[in-house]
Curated annotation (Swiss-Prot):
Subunit structure: Homodimer.
Keywords recorded for this protein, A-Z: Amino-acid biosynthesis, Aminotransferase, Arginine biosynthesis, Cytoplasm, Pyridoxal phosphate, Transferase
Keyword presence, Transferase: yes
The keyword Transferase is assigned to this record: yes
Domain of life: Bacteria
Gene Ontology CC, one term: cytoplasm
Details of cofactor binding: Binds 1 pyridoxal phosphate per subunit.
Annotated binding of pyridoxal 5'-phosphate, by residue: G105, T106, F138, D224, E225, V226, Q227, T283
Miscellaneous information on this protein: May also have succinyldiaminopimelate aminotransferase activity, thus carrying out the corresponding step in lysine biosynthesis.
Pfam family, one: Aminotran_3
Protein name: Acetylornithine aminotransferase 2
Obligatory cofactor(s): pyridoxal 5'-phosphate
Length: 405
């Protein structure tokens, strides 16, 4: 495979925080990407669950162009009608009453964490600052978010960890109950389906149980649906699978903008009671350009056509991947996840396997627990899914041959 990406550019002036593949793209359409070398790839990464409707979706392109000719940015010191419209739509389709708009998922998580602590302060309990996440979680790269995740890879070397952040282990019910019952606990934060942690889907009864425990002890439940929300599980929001397990606060982003930078922190009126004037803010959050695209993306994603397609195609994927697992037990250990957030746990190194898939012109993402993730556009067709399976089959054959060599 060619490692060339451009004859006129280099990474010399780019901070070296990314382990990039030797590959660059110049255009895309739907689930297809065309490299700078002119080669076509089937994209089952979708910007890590961000290009929810694929690349250059005509409806989003049209809305973006129309809004770009009118107004890009004004300050939040003024009313922004496009922001109000998207907030209305999000609240009408979720548990939430109010929304704060950001530019990314990690900013939405930061807002959620601040909202939770401010709630208890407004209730006359400022000592309630402790926030518990779970092992294997990923909540973003800003400082509170990495402390909520607790992954040493993301927090080591940056000085003292923030006080008030700890992690729990799924299945350790005694520790979970004790944490929630503590008089200094402010909130629990959880991904209903973990993404970076290896596509681990939290059982619905666990989410319902968390909500019940939180309500008993006055603790707020925060869901991070930055990756698993916006239709990826076959419902608009992943929490909808757990009746009675809805959150008090939720962070969303990624597919909400269809690839355009956007994020949102959703909350009930009660949970957001402490977020009064000047409690939080954002320069670019809620700008008219992002809001116009977000509203258009939401309308398409929440449609029965899109959500039914996710259920149909993800069911096909799961069936076919389990077939590959049966045929290649020396390569595939497990198939897991929910909807189009699919994890495949491997025996060979997942990064090596990603290269084998890329050799077949298939793009897949890495994940924790030696998984690779399939995160295709929500409108992927059965034919495209079948093509992806055929490419994965060839990658499995190559992995087997490599191990035998």
């Amino acid at each position: 495979m060619s490692t060339a990406t451009s004859s006129t550019t280099s990474q010399h002036h780019i901070m070296g925080v990314y382990n990039r593949a030797p590959l660059a793209f110049e255009r895309g359409r739907g689930a297809r990407l065309i490299s700078t070398e002119g080669e076509e790839y089937l994209d089952c990464v979708a910007g890590i669950a961000t290009n929810g409707l694929g690349h250059a979706h005509p409806a989003l392109v049209e809305v973006l162009k129309a809004q770009a000719e009118k107004l890009w940015h004004v300050s939040n010191i003024y009313r922004i009608p496009e922001q109000e419209e998207l907030a209305d739509a999000l609240c009408a389709n979720s548990f939430a009453d109010v929304v704060f708009f950001t530019n990314s998922g990690t900013e939405a998580v930061e807002c959620a964490l601040k909202t939770a602590r401010k709630y208890h302060s407004a209730n006359g309990q400022p000592e309630r600052i402790d926030i518990y996440g779970f092992d294997g979680s990923f909540h973003g790269r800003t400082y509170a978010a990495v402390n909520a995740s607790g992954n040493p890879s993301y927090v080591d070397g940056f000085g003292p960890r923030l006080p008030g952040y700890s992690q729990l282990t799924f299945g350790d019910h005694d520790a979970i109950k004790a944490a929630i019952a503590s008089p200094t606990t402010a909130a629990i934060i959880v991904e209903p389906v973990q993404g970076e942690g290896g596509a681990r889907s939290i059982p619905t009864q666990c989410l319902v149980g968390l909500r019940q425990l939180c309500d008993e002890h006055g603790v707020l439940l925060i869901y991070d649906e930055v990756q698993c929300g916006m239709g990826r599980t076959g419902k608009l929001f992943a929490y909808e699978w757990a009746e009675g397990g809805e959150p008090h606060i939720m962070a969303v982003a990624k597919a909400l903008g269809g690839g355009f930078p956007i994020g949102a922190c959703l909350a009930t009126t009660e949970a957001a009671k402490g977020m009064t004037v000047a409690a939080h803010g954002s320069t670019f959050g809620g700008n008219p350009l992002a809001m116009a695209v977000g509203k258009a993306a939401l309308e398409i994603i929440k449609s029965p056509e899109t959500l039914d397609n996710v259920k149909t195609v993800s069911g096909f994927f799961t069936q076919q991947l389990n077939g590959l697992k049966d045929r290649f037990p020396d390569v595939i250990v497990d198939v897991r996840g929910k909807g189009m957030l699919i994890g495949v746990k491997l025996i060979p190194n997942n990064r090596d396997f990603m290269v084998l898939a890329r050799d077949e012109k298939l793009l897949i993402a890495g994940g924790g627990d030696n998984c690779v993730r399939l995160l295709p556009p929500l409108n992927l067709t059965i034919e495209e899914a079948s093509e992806a399976i055929a490419k994965l089959e060839k990658a499995c054959e190559a992995a087997r041959a490599k191990a035998a060599a």
